[in-house]
């Protein structure tokens, strides 16, 4: 950091409270933060030093980096290993047995690294991760230059990474202490789900998060079976159960939230619980379709997650949001729901608010971190442009992302990572696949 530069574009989408779009806009970055925003001609008048680099051009769109609010990055190494199965069978017969055999810091580091480069190249600058061996996740993210909210997975049973709930919580506490002041890594506590965590474990997770002012990340009501089990075991639906035991406090991102009734949605809105909508994973596993339009109407902050690439099978938020918008229009028979501006908010500022980092990222405003994405609009499938939001949400592809900045550092230039050998990461993935395939 310490570098000053200008980024210009034909369209600058601020995602501020006024949803301002500046045509022929530009911004100035200094010491990793946005120093100034305005029209390109005015910016050039104010910053006349010819040595200041200028990125972008007159045929691009500049926007805040996308935020993936639910994923398991390292699971990219299980991409395509088991498809076309219901969630429970997919987990118990394929994913969990493979994790038991291969889960290690090396596996997590290599998988996370591959996921990070996939996310960066598709415009994601921050991801909210729930997994194990958090040190390996953090090191991979920092090496790749991406921002990450890293949640230590918490379960009641042992895995290759821990002996049980108290062990996972101790690891979470240690990780929080180490990374609480890091510029790229935000620690979190991630109790896996109601069906894998006891009441005591859920409450201990919440207390640890509240004490350290870090986010909570949990799977919630992903399948109807999960709701039935909660009713059977606890006498209440999942959201009502969590409210009843006193869990719903702090900054919570609830992944999936597919099977919520109206009362549960009201509770989510009341308690300011963020929802990470993972439409592709939910569709592929036949888990159901979350009532996103209804949630948004009732004031729930909904953002987008990809889930892990093992169930998606990619980490492309542009694809995710386009499908989400169309599915909601279809199931509600209302073409006005999830309009293109709402969709952009779900990728950016609403996601930041869900994670409690809206003062730092999520919009292009002075003082915020320079997490930025430049999209090349000079493509046949992106022209003509009448509404830039529409072009991005309904027409753009991950491959249209050309340049990506994180924390004021140019990480992706012309679609290539600037300081990592992509081929090396691909070769490692192939090596892991051979081991897993032959096991």
UniProtKB/Swiss-Prot annotation:
* Annotated InterPro entries: Amidohydro-rel, Deaminase_MtaD/DadD, Metal-dep_hydrolase_composite, Metal_Hydrolase, MTA/SAH_deaminase
Q: Which cofactors is this protein said to need?
A: Zn(2+)
Q: Does the keyword Oxidoreductase apply?
A: no
Cite a single Pfam family from the UniProt record: Amidohydro_1
The question of whether Signal is a record keyword is answered with no
Reaction catalyzed: S-adenosyl-L-homocysteine + H2O + H(+) = S-inosyl-L-homocysteine + NH4(+); S-methyl-5'-thioadenosine + H2O + H(+) = S-methyl-5'-thioinosine + NH4(+)
Q: Name one GO molecular function term.
A: 5'-methylthioadenosine deaminase activity
Chain sites annotated for binding substrate? 99, 192, 222, 307
Q: What class of enzyme is it?
A: hydrolase
Q: Which domain of life is it from?
A: Bacteria
EC code: 3.5.4.28, 3.5.4.31
UniProt KW keywords = Hydrolase, Metal-binding, Zinc
Cofactor annotation remark: Binds 1 zinc ion per subunit.
The residues the record assigns to binding Zn(2+) are 70, 72, 219, 307
- Supply the PANTHER family for this chain: AMIDOHYDROLASE-RELATED DOMAIN-CONTAINING PROTEIN (PTHR43794:SF11), AMINOHYDROLASE SSNA-RELATED (PTHR43794)
The entry's family comment says: Belongs to the metallo-dependent hydrolases superfamily. MTA/SAH deaminase family.
- Tell me the function of this protein: Catalyzes the deamination of 5-methylthioadenosine and S-adenosyl-L-homocysteine into 5-methylthioinosine and S-inosyl-L-homocysteine, respectively. Is also able to deaminate adenosine.
The protein's name is: 5-methylthioadenosine/S-adenosylhomocysteine deaminase
Origin species, per record, is: Thermodesulfovibrio yellowstonii (strain ATCC 51303 / DSM 11347 / YP87)
